[in-house]
Amino acid sequence: MADILVVEDEDNIATALDFLLSRDGHKHRRMATGAGALEEIRASHPDLVLLDVMLPDVSGYQIVQDVRADPALNDVRVLLMTARGSVVERRKGLALGADGFIAKPFELSELRAELARLLGGRC
């Protein structure tokens, strides 16, 4: 199973993600703010980061840019999550280097499909 870092400030979404990831056997942990997220990504080198775009202290877009600027993190997958699921937002996230984009609220089956796509055999 995969090692996943969840960066999400909304408790109800974080709880749903915890339920899904635990049930599917993934190792995961949560950060509620962007502060320290990049350091955690560098230190733990997760397989995937589930990253909220609208964090209270830093934009998820900035974190994606920082991850993609570090060659040592090229294999870390990033799935952006946002309540603003417009085509413009999706294009922006993907252009900055995100591997996927999912609009909140999402169905668990939709998230599972994205996890399978991004993680391949580790899902």
Please name every model-derived segment.
Residues 30-48:
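Acidic, metal-coordinating helix/loop segments flanking the phosphotransfer/catalytic sites
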Residues 33, 59-65:
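Acidic catalytic/metal-coordinating carboxylates
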Residues 11-29, 118:
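Two-component/phosphorelay signaling modules centered on CheY-like receiver
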Residues 8:
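Conserved acidic carboxylate
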Residues 18, 62, 85-100, 113:
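Alpha4 helix (beta4-alpha4-beta5 surface) of REC/receiver domains from two-component response regulators
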Residues 106-116:
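C-terminal output helix
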Residues 56, 74, 86:
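The feature encodes the CheY-like receiver
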